[in-house]
């Protein structure tokens, strides 16, 4: 994924341009969907203690934001769009760091690429099932 399919050599892992890397994540999702069958997958995002760094980072930056919820969908594009929108809509002051990281790294591009591949819709409807929030 990190080399956008251009190499399997470790030395080349981080040589792809950033947008190609983001597009390869959408391609990887498509591969899983094709293999497993879209009807057999439910996606869950746990948006708690949000850091600007990827969860794959061995030494991530401390969390900038608190919990904004657990999101689930059978549509991975709608799910990720809802999570990004929740960051922007949050009243948490720490959101500024996440928004800066999203915008400076074109982070929404994976959602755009997945939508372009037909993996889902960027439109969604949120339904709160937490009785404490109603």
Where are these regions (language model features)?
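Extended, low-polarity segments enriched in aliphatic/aromatic residues
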Residues: 1-134
């Amino acid at each position: 994924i990190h080399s956008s399919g251009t190499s399997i050599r470790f030395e080349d892992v981080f040589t792809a341009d950033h947008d190609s890397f983001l597009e390869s994540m959408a391609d990887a999702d498509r591969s899983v969907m094709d293999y497993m069958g879209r009807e057999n997958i439910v996606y869950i995002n746990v948006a708690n203690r949000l850091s600007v760094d990827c969860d794959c980072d061995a030494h991530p930056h401390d969390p900038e934001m608190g919990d904004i919820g657990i999101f689930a969908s059978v549509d991975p594009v709608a799910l990720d769009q809802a999570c990004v929108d929740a960051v922007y809509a949050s009243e948490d002051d720490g959101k500024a760091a996440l928004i800066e990281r999203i915008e400076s790294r074109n982070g929404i591009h994976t959602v755009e690429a997945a939508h372009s591949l037909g993996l889902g819709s960027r439109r969604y409807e949120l339904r709160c099932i937490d009785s404490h929030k109603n």
